[in-house]
């Protein structure tokens, strides 16, 4: 149980690190060789599906197939080159300087080397002492078990996926949803929607 209320529980992909464009780039360059030794690129993004949360719809493949690709991607060296979400570095570092601690809760992978790569990347971008007590779950796993550890604390919980944001309410947390095209059809009276970490800083500072 946390001893301080100056703790922010936060997702990573789509909140701290840019994931969807990074994954799309990886998918589009993924290639194979046919029986004649010719290289081909089988994956194409579907233009009118790019605002969907479900990646299977974006690429016109089955959910089982896309899950295999995501598992491979999330344990690849590409985890070491994810870019920070726009302007997130400025405001996360400022919050840390003001005494806030961040606990990442991310459904990245159960692969230990890939988890270490994620930790290193977050440290490179935001600082080695900003994050603590990493809770890294299997690829795509529900976060209820991790959130349950903070039941009744009233901590802020930053997410980009509506399902996970609402899950925080079950444990007495204060969900904040980072705005993305794929979650704009979601509304909930107890979930705060923000554009970026600047908005979050204003909320935590009592300015919004």
Question: Locations of the language-model features?
Answer:
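Active-site neighborhood of HAD-like aspartate-dependent phosphohydrolases
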Residues: 1-63
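Conserved Lys-Pro-Asp/Glu-containing loop-to-beta segment of HAD-superfamily phosphomonoesterases
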Residues: 142-168
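Acidic, Mg2+-coordinating phosphoryl-transfer loop and its flanking beta/alpha structural elements
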Residues: 158-195
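Substrate-recognition element of Asp-dependent hydrolases with the DxDx(T/V) motif
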Residues: 78-84, 88-122
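A short, structured active-site edge motif that brings together acidic residues
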Residues: 103-110, 119, 125-143
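Short, basic/glycine-rich phosphate-binding loops at helix/coil junctions
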Residues: 58-75, 99-102, 126-129
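Conserved acidic residues
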Residues: 6, 132, 155, 191
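Short acidic-hydrophobic, aromatic-tinged amphipathic segments that line or gate anion-handling sites
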Residues: 134-139, 191-199
């Amino acid at each position: 149980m946390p001893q301080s209320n100056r703790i922010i529980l936060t997702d990573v992909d789509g909140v701290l690190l840019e994931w969807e464009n990074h994954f799309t780039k990886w998918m589009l360059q993924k290639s194979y060789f046919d029986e004649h030794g010719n290289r081909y690129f089988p994956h194409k993004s579907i233009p009118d599906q790019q605002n969907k949360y479900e990646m299977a719809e974006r690429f016109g493949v089955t959910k089982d197939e896309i899950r295999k690709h995501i598992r491979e991607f999330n344990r690849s060296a590409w985890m070491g080159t994810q870019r920070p979400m726009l302007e997130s570095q400025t405001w996360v570092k400022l919050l840390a300087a003001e005494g806030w601690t961040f606990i990442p809760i991310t459904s990245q992978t159960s692969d230990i080397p890939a988890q270490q790569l994620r930790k290193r990347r977050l440290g490179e971008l935001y600082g080695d002492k900003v994050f603590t007590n990493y809770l890294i779950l299997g690829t795509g796993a529900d976060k209820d078990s991790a959130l349950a550890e903070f039941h009744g604390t009233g901590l802020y919980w930053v997410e980009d996926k509506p399902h996970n944001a609402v899950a925080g309410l079950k444990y007495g947390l204060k969900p904040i949803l980072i705005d993305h095209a794929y979650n704009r059809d979601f509304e909930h009276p107890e979930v705060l929607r923000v554009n970026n970490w600047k908005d979050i800083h204003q909320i935590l500072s009592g300015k919004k």
